[in-house]
């Protein structure tokens, strides 16, 4: 099935754009949502995380203590790799399972770290980047998540640069000051193009 990899930095508006594609009938497979699901109470990753990192990283409800884990992986590169060794295979497995059952004309994979991963670029037919400048990212995330500026800057620094994302893009949606209506119009135009690509891929 024809597939699009949708990516962008934190706070760029990936979820808003993905929701617009979903309303038009595309199948959305969001790796962030899958990551949250496997680290929720009774999530597939939780027994492995508890065994690897200890019970102190499990919240009272049985989910991942995200704040504690975030602090650890930002200060300890080996801890980040140990966490990813647990979560990434499970995310891949769930991602492929959802893609196999897709009912839409094409699939949009929402992958925040698509450019960084190295493998996703060859997994999808087109890469769509939702782009905005770093100051816009910082303003959105501090307002949305309650993070400090320094916390957001640290997250941005660990992600691919804006230039690297744009270099990997087949399509770009600029989302610094776009209204939802403007985004919807851009998504609708891309949707028509992707429908044509999906039809050509089936023939």
UniProtKB/Swiss-Prot annotation:
It comes from the Bacteria. It is found in: Cytoplasm. GO terms for cellular component: cytoplasm. Pathway: Cofactor biosynthesis; coenzyme A biosynthesis; CoA from (R)-pantothenate: step 5/5. GO terms for biological process: coenzyme A biosynthetic process. ATP binds at residues 11-16. It catalyses: 3'-dephospho-CoA + ATP = ADP + CoA + H(+). Keywords: ATP-binding, Coenzyme A biosynthesis, Cytoplasm, Kinase, Nucleotide-binding, Transferase. Its main location: cytoplasm. Its EC number is 2.7.1.24. InterPro entries: Depp_CoAkinase, P-loop_NTPase. Residues 3-201 form the DPCK domain. The keyword Cytoplasm applies. Pfam families: CoaE. GO terms for molecular function: ATP binding; dephospho-CoA kinase activity. NCBIfam families: dephospho-CoA kinase. PANTHER family: BIFUNCTIONAL COENZYME A SYNTHASE-RELATED, DEPHOSPHO-COA KINASE-RELATED. Catalyzes the phosphorylation of the 3'-hydroxyl group of dephosphocoenzyme A to form coenzyme A. This is Dephospho-CoA kinase. It comes from Burkholderia pseudomallei (strain K96243).
């Amino acid at each position: 099935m024809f597939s699009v990899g949708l990516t962008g930095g934190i706070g760029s508006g990936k979820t808003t754009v993905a929701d617009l594609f979903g309303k038009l009938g595309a199948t959305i497979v969001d790796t962030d949502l899958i990551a949250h699901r496997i680290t929720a109470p009774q999530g597939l990753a939780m027994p492995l995380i508890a065994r690897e990192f200890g019970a102190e990283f499990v919240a009272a409800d049985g989910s991942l203590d995200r704040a504690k884990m975030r602090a650890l992986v930002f200060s300890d590169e080996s801890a980040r790799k140990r966490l990813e060794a647990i979560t990434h295979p499970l995310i891949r497995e769930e991602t492929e399972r959802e893609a196999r059952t897709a009912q839409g004309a094409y699939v949009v994979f929402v992958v925040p770290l698509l450019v960084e991963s190295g493998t996703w670029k060859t997994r999808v037919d087109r890469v769509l980047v939702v782009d905005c400048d770093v100051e816009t990212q910082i303003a959105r995330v501090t307002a949305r998540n309650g993070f400090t500026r320094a916390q957001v800057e640290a997250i941005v620094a660990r992600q691919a640069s804006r230039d690297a994302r744009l270099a990997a893009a087949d399509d770009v949606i600029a989302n610094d000051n776009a209204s939802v209506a403007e985004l919807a119009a851009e998504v609708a135009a891309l949707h028509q193009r992707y429908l044509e690509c999906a039809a050509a891929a089936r023939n």
